A protein has these predicted regions:
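Glycine-/small-residue-enriched transmembrane alpha-helix faces in small-molecule transporters
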Residues: 1-46, 85, 93, 153-180, ...
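C-terminal-most transmembrane helix of multi-pass membrane proteins
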Residues: 2-10, 52, 149-150, 220-222, ...
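Membrane-interface helix-cap regions at the ends of transmembrane helices
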Residues: 7, 30-33, 37, 41, ...
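Hydrophobic alpha-helical transmembrane segments of multi-pass integral membrane proteins
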Residues: 15-20, 46-61, 65, 77-78, ...
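Helix-helix packing/entry segments at the starts of transmembrane helices
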Residues: 25, 50, 106-112, 178-199, ...
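Specific transmembrane alpha-helical segments of multi-pass solute transporters/efflux pumps
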Residues: 27, 31-32, 60-106, 110, ...
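Hydrophobic transmembrane alpha-helices of multi-pass small-molecule transport proteins
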Residues: 59, 81, 87, 120, ...
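Loop-to-transmembrane alpha-helix entry segments
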Residues: 73-78, 110, 126-146, 154-161, ...
Length: 306
C-alpha cells in the first residue's frame, strides 16, 4: 500500500469515527423514551433487564450468522469484565435517576462525563488539553446548563443528582477503558460480553428489589425493543468505533448531542415548550461538537503532512 493510500485510509477512518461518535450520542440520547414504562409500575432494573436481554439475543444471532468465535484470552476477559460492570453501573444509576427527576434534566446533567473524561485523561494518562478542547468543554457545559437550569429556582433531587454523577463517572471510565484496552475483536463480540454483564446484573438487581417485572402490553414491548436496538446495540457498536478511531475525549465531547436529543424528544413527542434559552443552549452544544470535529481533522492532517 502506497503512502497516499495509507493516508487516505487513515483519514476515512477518522471521518467514520467522527460519524460514529455523533451517531452513538444521538442513539443514546433516546434513553428517556424508556421512562414511560415506569407509569406501568416497572422498576429500573426490570426495564434494563429486558432492554439488555433483547439486545443480547439480537447480538448473539448476528454473531451466529457471522460465525464469529466467542473465545477470549485472560487479558480480554478482564477488560470485558471491566467494561460490562462499568456500563451496568452507568445505565442502572441513570435509569434510577429517571424516577427522581425529569428525564430531560437527568440526561443533560449526565453530560458532565466529557469533562470527567478529559480530566481523567489529563491526570492519569498525560493527555494534553488543547485550547480547542477546553473551549469545546466550556461551550458544551454552558449549553447544558442552559438546558436544565430553571429560572423559577426549582430544586432538583440531591439523590437524583448523585446518581446521575455516578452514571457520568462510570460512563467516562467506560469510554477510556474501551480506548486503552485495544481489544482486537469486532464491536459485536465486545458488546456480546458487555451485554451479558448488563443483563445478568440487572436481573440480579430485579430479584433483589422484589422480583422481575414483565411488560404488560404491545406498546410496552415496542418501547423495550426500541431500547434494545437503538440506545443499546446501535449506540454501543458505534461507540466502539468512535473510541477506536478518534479517541476518548473527542468521543465524549460529541456526546453533547445526547442532551440535545433528549430536549428535542421532549419538544416534539411530549409537547414541551421551546424557549430562547433552549435555543441558545442547543446552539452552544452544536458549536462545541463542530469545534472538536474540526480540531480532530486538523490534527489528522498535520500528522499526515509533516
Amino acid at each position: 500500500m502506497s503512502d497516499n493510500q495509507h493516508n487516505t485510509l487513515r483519514t476515512n477512518k477518522k471521518i467514520f469515527g467522527t460519524l460514529c461518535g455523533i451517531g452513538a450520542a444521538v442513539c443514546y440520547g433516546t434513553n428517556p423514551l424508556g421512562a414511560q414504562l415506569y407509569s406501568e409500575g416497572m422498576q429500573p432494573a426490570s426495564v434494563l433487564f429486558w432492554r439488555f436481554g433483547l439486545a443480547f439475543i439480537i447480538i448473539a444471532i448476528v454473531m451466529m450468522f457471522r460465525k464469529e468465535s466467542l473465545r477470549i484470552n485472560r487479558r480480554e476477559f478482564y477488560a470485558l469484565t471491566g467494561l460490562g460492570l462499568l456500563f451496568l453501573a452507568s445505565s442502572l444509576t441513570l435509569y434510577m435517576s429517571f424516577k427522581l427527576m425529569a428525564v430531560g434534566v437527568a440526561s443533560t446533567i449526565l453530560f458532565v462525563y466529557p469533562v470527567l473524561t478529559a480530566g481523567i485523561m489529563a491526570l492519569f494518562f498525560k493527555e494534553r488539553l488543547t485550547f480547542s478542547t477546553i473551549l469545546s468543554i466550556v461551550l458544551s457545559f454552558v449549553g447544558v446548563l442552559l438546558l436544565y437550569w430553571s429560572p423559577d429556582g426549582t430544586r432538583l433531587s440531591a439523590t437524583g443528582i448523585v446518581l446521575v454523577l455516578i452514571s457520568a463517572l462510570t460512563y467516562a471510565v467506560y469510554i477510556i477503558v474501551m480506548n486503552r484496552a485495544k481489544l482486537n475483536m469486532s464491536s459485536f463480540k465486545i458488546n456480546f460480553y458487555v451485554l451479558i454483564y448488563c443483563a445478568l446484573g440487572n436481573l440480579a438487581m430485579a430479584f433483589c428489589s422484589g422480583g422481575l417485572q414483565v411488560p404488560q402490553n404491545a406498546t410496552s414491548w415496542l418501547c423495550v425493543s426500541w431500547l434494545a436496538v437503538v440506545p443499546a446495540i446501535l449506540a454501543l457498536v458505534m461507540m466502539v468505533y468512535a473510541a477506536k478511531y478518534i479517541g476518548s475525549t473527542p468521543t465524549a465531547i460529541m456526546g453533547a448531542l445526547e442532551p440535545t436529543t433528549a430536549v428535542l424528544i421532549g419538544i416534539f413527542l411530549f409537547g414541551e415548550p421551546f424557549t430562547s434559552r433552549l435555543a441558545v443552549g442547543i446552539a452552544l452544544i452544536f458549536a462545541a461538537v463542530i469545534i472538536i470535529a474540526l480540531k480532530s481533522n486538523k490534527k489528522e492532517k498535520a500528522s499526515l503532512n509533516p
